[in-house]
Amino acid sequence: MITIARPLLLALLLSCSVGHPASAAPSSRSTASDIVSEADCFSMGSYDQWMAGLRAKNGLLKSLLIRWKFPEDEFTRHRRNLDCRAITYRSDGHLVRGWLVRPKHGASTGKLPVIVYNRGGNRGYGALTFAHLFTHVFPLAESGYVVAASQYRGVMSAQDAASSPDQFGGDDVRDVTNLLRIVSRLPGSDPDNLFMLGQSRGAIMTFRALRETTLPIRAVAIYSGVYDLHDLLAMRPAFDGLFEVLIPDYRRHRKAELDKRSVTRWPGQLPPRTGVLMIHGDEDERAPLRSARTFAVELDRLGRPYKLVVHPGESHFLDGVRPEVHAQTLQWFERFRQRPGQ
């Protein structure tokens, strides 16, 4: 099914580089004990103290832009309604940073559905800051979900980046599958209602994790996803040099490594009942829309549940239709959510 949605007015893109990502560590059993440290996301104190910290780190102009985008009443509402933690968790012997956000008031059943959010970018670029949570994570948690997000390995420190580097969808996929297992076992999480959301490169992490995890994932949503690295290289040839840095044995096994990270090459290996929502802008200059359309054709051929939503006039970040994208995602997840007694 392909739906063409109408855009809203284009919103101002703000790149927020503040906050404190979480830390993490490894384990074979993936229980709550794999969270080795956690800290309150709002530990900076008041809204004014947060703004003062932003000014000191990013300068006056950027702090004013962030103040405009995230007003004090929004900060206060999230602080009142959400339990937000910067965490460090264990993943195969590595310490990995992340975020864990839950509604403070829970659900009448005592169990809440879970979303694992898979970010875009590589290494430190695209890492989720506290300010990013306002756009990407808090709205999902306010809608009644436990939301966990990984920074992926290699983001703890320069030493960590050298000893456990980002592989752009290689061994680092285990950071997602381990986080899924950890958060599904936390008190208040509903292990029967697990979902994933991937943005840009996060699509690679989402689909590889979906193929490899033993946990039942009910549905996934992908924003501006990378579905085929061959198409990405055709669109952005400079990525060839980046892949040589990030992907082990890239020059010797180039096609095999690209195929491994390209869901268009193995759609039949995905769980047949997991619903796939794809949201893309038709002016995306970073991730090719044609890959999403190719993947949609394959899912249709296989008879899999899916939906492709294309927003006219929208770029990679979908800023002009963010409320619509959020609503479309929640509607999709609700469609596949298991209710008590089902």
Q: Where do the model's predicted regions map?
A:
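Mobile cap/lid helix-loop segments that gate and shape the active-site cleft of serine hydrolases
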Residues: 127, 226-269
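Conserved alpha/beta-hydrolase "acid-adjacent" motif
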Residues: 285-291
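Short beta-strand/loop motif that positions the catalytic acidic residue
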Residues: 277-280, 284
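N-terminal targeting or regulatory segments adjacent to alpha/beta-hydrolase or S9 domains
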Residues: 5, 13-82
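N-terminal cap/lid segment of alpha/beta-hydrolase-fold proteins
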Residues: 61-109
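Alpha/beta-hydrolase active-site loop
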Residues: 166-186
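C-terminal catalytic histidine-bearing segment of alpha/beta-hydrolase fold enzymes
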Residues: 293-342
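Short substrate-entry loop that stabilizes the transition state in hydrolases
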Residues: 107-112, 117-159, 229-230
